[in-house]
Amino acid sequence: PKDKAMTLLERVIRNHRCRSTHHFIAFDALSLISGDEGEAWKSLFLVHHEHLLKGAKAPDAEFKDFKNHVLHVSEGEWGGARGKAQEWYARGVELLSKKRWSEAAYAFGVLSHYYADPIQPFHTGQTEAEGVIHRAVEWSIAKSRAETDARIETSGYPEIDVPDGMGFVSDMVREGAERSHAHYDTFIDHYDFDAGVANPPAGLDETMQAAIADLVAYATAGFAAILSRGIEEAAVAPPKVNLTLQGYFETLDIPLRWITAKLEDAADKRTVERMYAEFQKTGKVIKTLPADDKKIRALHAKEVRRIPLKQLDAEEIAPIGTLNENRLAAEPLELTQQAEDIVDDIPPAELAEISRRDSTKSGIRGLFGTRKRSAPEPEEAEVAADAEEASSAEILFDAEEEPAETVQPAKAPKVEEDGSPRRLASITRDDPVVDAPSIGRKTAK
């Protein structure tokens, strides 16, 4: 990839629209599109960035196909990420060849999600220790975007070799999963849950920050390489478009976006605090696991380990964060009463399953080797629902009058998919991730 600085328009769009790691990967890849017409293709996708970014979150927000978000490289490649990425690549190329620009942008956005998810180490394996901190780690990653940007600006993006053959996208998903899986145990050993629940970036030490920047840069460059190959395969020329800052400003909905980001921040904070409270009280996280994590945990227990959930619930977990380089003798976070109460605040639908668990309390190894009892007695209640992501389709820029073909963003296609979601990181907290500084494009030497 070439060294490219973002234009003012690109920086405005990036800061206004991107709210998750998936968004940043898909958007930043546009500046790395190769070929003589790379800039023209970037401009086209900028016109349709709403569809690209909507697609980048669709597997989490719409499809909810949990198993397709993972690839367990040490467990017979359990998971469906390879097939889904290949499927959406083919769909994106077909739409490009038909000049259905907005639909193609959506399809490639979806592809970016299935490609990037296995480049998050916790999407390449499954352990009880990981389950405790999975959501917290992703929250910390999202809230550390400024640090990640700065590191990538310094080190640059890697050169990606695109394999030969019809299944090259599938092969690239596997290569990314293998690269990230090397950090699986590292993330468990180095994440400071105590620090991260109070201040998300503080949960990451130097080892984790370096690994995160490397993986995010790799995922971004990898998706750009796939997108470049898809453009080449579609064998069509990009239409000319007129990108103006004024045209973009006319579409701004800053108050709505700001409110949505704040709601998402509050929901993510509440989720992580509840998980932390359960861990402090029981030594595990079972009842407060997000729905996607629960589904993957249950499927993995059934299809890979072939054990009942009751047996899995009783297992001890490995110590967490024992190698964190920033650990200080600090007092644990004092949680609010609301967070403490949530451990006993279980939806009625889950009580039947919980009641079947072994009532015998056994010693379980908690954070850094402390011993904790296995579970509290549940009471029937409803857990507050997380805020749903608000989305709106917008027509942003006018096409130039020169070309015969006009560019008019259309609604992203509705695609029916089975399953439920898995996540890389659509998480924010008190200040939106969009405050991350813009960066130029640099290539690792």
PLM regions: where:
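Divalent metal-coordination and catalytic microenvironments
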Residues: 113
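Intrinsically disordered, compositionally biased tail regions
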Residues: 336, 341-372, 376-379, 387-445
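Short active-site segment of divalent metal-dependent hydrolases/proteases
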Residues: 116-120
